[in-house]
Amino acid sequence: FQRGIGDTTDVVQKEMYTFDDKGGRSITLRPEGTAGAVRSFLENGLCNEALPQKVCYLTSCYRYEKPQAGRLREFHQFGVECFGSASPLADAEIIALAKSLFDSLGVKDLSLEINSIGCPTCRAEYHKALKEYFSSRKDELCDTCKGRLDRNPMRILDCKSPICHEIAKGAPVVIDYLCDECREHFEMVQKYLKAQNIEYTINPQIVRGL
């Protein structure tokens, strides 16, 4: 899980149930379903079949976080994955599937926010810009974000601290740092969503999962 979702994420740093069993082995209860889906995809040889492969799963997960309305420490995650395709159509298809699911459940007043975090090359340049911006206001950041500044400054954009949230509003926008290929990809995702009459807004501060 640490390799899959990153050492600097809240899930790894604050929310995983990790303990040693009676045999002295380190045990972690599954905090999310994606890593297990990828492992199953590889171990069962689906990567050797015709691609892309589309899968779905429903599994129980556990996170040590503050219980609140609608959020428990044991929960179920329903996920869909499209392995073997980097097509913007695949991204739009999953978004459309999510909308269709909520529509079928009769859920109203939903809003869709999207963003692109580009490729590793894009993010490297963006990290530099963020680090420069947040370094100038480091003394105002919460202790957690001060630690994130060197390791993964993008995570500061996701901080729940009111002060950090306000500072992040003036930060550089990731879309401005996308390379030509990533920019075209994001534009095509938007084109496909519009073709299906799916309304959305772009939120450049969505960086979950990094």
PLM features per residue range, with description:
Residues 1-210:
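TRNA-recognition modules of translation machinery and tRNA-sensing kinases, especially anticodon-binding
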